[in-house]
């Protein structure tokens, strides 16, 4: 089948151990990263937000599989460049995204992980849960959802009156 979302493995194979999930990603991560495409309008919206003077910080929990390695960071940077996604800072290996968001003065945090959104929101940072295959059927009355990057852009301007 087609894996369209990085969290889909954990959702589809919830009976897997963390070791099995790590083994899967060790084997297939680069291939998945190579063929993945940005969500519709993501590139354009991020570019527009950057042009409006916003700092774009990409916070990901992706981590290097080998200590001292840079393979995941290199592929991530190449993917961002290939897809025209502009950013000021890339933070990899962020297991505590609230801490990273605070360290980088994040005004609006966007993620498709319910866990990460709840964590960041607990620190009083405005948060949007990007709806994806892995979270669309989950009730999240405590989180505000975004269904597209165009909607993210509109919500950002509503929140911050820019």
Question: How would you name each of these model-derived features?
Answer:
Residues 33-37, 42-76:
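Substrate-recognition element of Asp-dependent hydrolases with the DxDx(T/V) motif
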Residues 55-57, 89, 108, 126-128:
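A structural signal for isolated positions on well-ordered beta-strands in alpha/beta enzyme cores
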Residues 76-90, 139-162:
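Structural recognition of alpha->loop->beta junctions
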Residues 50-51, 81, 121:
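Anion (oxyanion) recognition and catalysis
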Residues 61-108, 114-118:
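Substrate-recognition "cap/lid" segment bordering the active-site pocket of phosphatases
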Residues 109-147:
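Acidic, Mg2+-coordinating phosphoryl-transfer loop and its flanking beta/alpha structural elements
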Residues 1-44:
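Metal-dependent phosphoesterase signature
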């Amino acid at each position: 089948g087609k894996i369209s979302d990085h969290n889909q493995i954990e959702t589809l194979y919830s009976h897997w151990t963390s070791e099995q999930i790590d083994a899967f990603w060790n084997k297939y991560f680069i291939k998945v990263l190579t063929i993945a495409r940005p969500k519709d309008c993501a590139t354009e919206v991020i570019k527009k937000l950057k042009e409006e003077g916003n700092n774009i910080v990409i916070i990901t929990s992706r981590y290097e599989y080998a200590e001292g390695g840079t393979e995941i960071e290199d592929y991530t940077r190449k993917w961002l460049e290939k897809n025209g996604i502009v950013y000021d800072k890339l933070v990899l290996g962020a297991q505590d995204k609230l801490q990273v968001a605070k360290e980088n003065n994040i005004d609006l945090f966007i993620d498709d992980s319910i866990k990460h959104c709840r964590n960041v929101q607990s620190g009083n940072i405005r948060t949007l849960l990007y709806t994806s295959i892995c979270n669309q059927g989950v009730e999240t009355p405590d989180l505000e959802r975004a269904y597209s990057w165009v909607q993210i852009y509109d919500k950002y301007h509503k929140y911050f009156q820019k």
